[in-house]
Each structure stands twice: as structure tokens, then as C-alpha cells.
Amino acid sequence: MKTFLILALLAIVATTARIAVRVPVPQLQPQNPSQQQPQEQVPLVQQQQFPGQQQPFPPQQPYPQPQPFPSQQPYLQLQPFPQPQLPYPQPQLPYPQPQLPYPQPQPFRPQQPYPQSQPQYSQPQQPISQQQQQQQQQQQQKQQQQQQQQILQQILQQQLIPCRDVVLQQHSIAYGSSQVLQQSTYQLVQQLCCQQLWQIPEQSRCQAIHNVVHAIILHQQQQQQQQQQQQPLSQVSFQQPQQQYPSGQGSFQPSQQNPQAQGSVQPQQLPQFEEIRNLALETLPAMCNVYIPPYCTIAPVGIFGTN
């Protein structure tokens, strides 16, 4: 573009130079016809040519036309050069764009398969864990059975002592024994017995009553042994539990040996066991308004030392 403009300017300058060279010729010629009048006809033709040649004099208007030199507006048109600059920032965009994948590989955490591979190691251990679970379940069942037995033993030792004394009271009254509790103490024992029976689940009440009957038989055996040793107890054995009823614990300490002595009841004691059991089944449910399953009338297996 610059070269083209330069050539155009040179062409304009050349034309103007030519016009300038031709201009003085007609200026000298009109002076000649003024001095040489006979030659006026010849210059007429020349003058006819001059107007044709002088006509470019008004086209000196191109002199303002070279004013297009300020028409360097093409230079303004060259301003598109900033337009090509636009792609320069445009290519800059891909430069930050490739930077995006650099943070994008951060999500690429190949460490995740490592924890995923860990379950693969744990998966072959699953059959082992299943066997362990079965063993644990069996152990838990055994432990639960042992815990239930221990709970029943604790119930016998602590909670059902009032029920034992209530049945003993009824048994003593039935046989006219002198070992009878006072009325106030007996009412307190009844309340404690009912509270304990209400807390026992219905499925365990039958076994609890059998344990009460068993405790009564063992208590009677203890009294017989003490009588044989000629140790008069009179009402001492009843006075000690009276002081400990509010705490829920009786003075019947031999009950701690009941787990070992549960199988010590002999078959010849079956009539005595049935008698006390019937008395307990008649007294406790009616006194405490508690439901006792009908199968409770059957003696539990193994209580008499038989399998």
C-alpha cells in the first residue's frame, strides 16, 4: 500500500510538473501576439489548442485533490492492523485452555483403584468371615443361653426372694407353723414380689416360678439340716430378710449355690415340689394379677437330676 501511494504521488507530481512546464509557454505566447499583431491568426489555432490545453488549468483542482494526502485515511484503513491483533489475543485463549487440562488431570486420581483393590483382598476373606459369623452366632447363642440362666439365677437370688417368702408364708399358714411374718412385713413382701413378677417377661414367668419352688425346697432342706444340728433358729431366719426387703435382697445366701444345686433335687422330692408349685401357682398369679402360661404345670426337664 505504501509503495502504491508513493507511486501515485510521484505520478501526480509528474503531471503537475508537466502542467507547470506547459503553463509558461502560453504565457510567453500571449506576450508575443501583443507585440506581433500579424501573427495573431496563428496563435488562434494555438489558442484553440491552449484552451484545450488550458482546460487542465482548472483541473488544478487536483491540487486540493492531493489534499487526499490527508487522505492518509487509508492509514486509518490500515487500522485493521489492530484487527489482526485480535487473533493474537485469540490464540492466547488456547494457551489458558491447555492450562485447563492441567487442573483436569487432578481429578485423575489413580489412587482410587488402590482402595478399590483393597476390597478385592477383603473379598476372598468374606467366606472366612462367614464362617466366623456362623461361629460367632453359635457362640452368641450359647452366651445368650448362659446369660439367660445367669439372669434367672440373679432373679432367684435377688428379685424373687420376696415371692419365695410369700409362698413360704402361705405354706407355713397351711401347716400351722410358728414361723409366720408380721402383717406389715408380709404386705411389703407382697408388693415387692408383684413388682418383680411384672418386670419378668411372660415367657420367663413359668421358669421363674419353678425357680421359686426350687428355692423353697432348698430352703426347707437347709432348715432340716439346721434342726438336725440342734441350732434353734425360731424366727431368726425370717427376721433377717425383713430388714433387707427394701433393698430387694434377701438373707437366703445358700441360693448362690443354686446353679450347682439345681440338679440336686431328687425324684423322691417330686410330691413336695408339686405341692409347693401348686401353692405358688394358686397364690402368685391371683395376688399380682399376672398371667402364667398353662404349660407351667409341667415340671421342667433336668430339675430333678434327669436329662
Curated annotation (Swiss-Prot):
Q: Which Gene3D superfamilies match?
A: Plant lipid-transfer and hydrophobic proteins
Post-translational modification remark: Substrate of transglutaminase.
Q: Which Pfam families match?
A: Gliadin (PF13016)
Query: Region Sufficient to initiate the primary inflammatory response to gluten in Celiac Sprue patients: which residues?
Result: 76-108
GO MF annotations, alphabetized: nutrient reservoir activity
Describe its function: Gliadin is the major seed storage protein in wheat.
Which protein, by its recorded name, is this?
Alpha/beta-gliadin MM1
Record the organism: Triticum aestivum
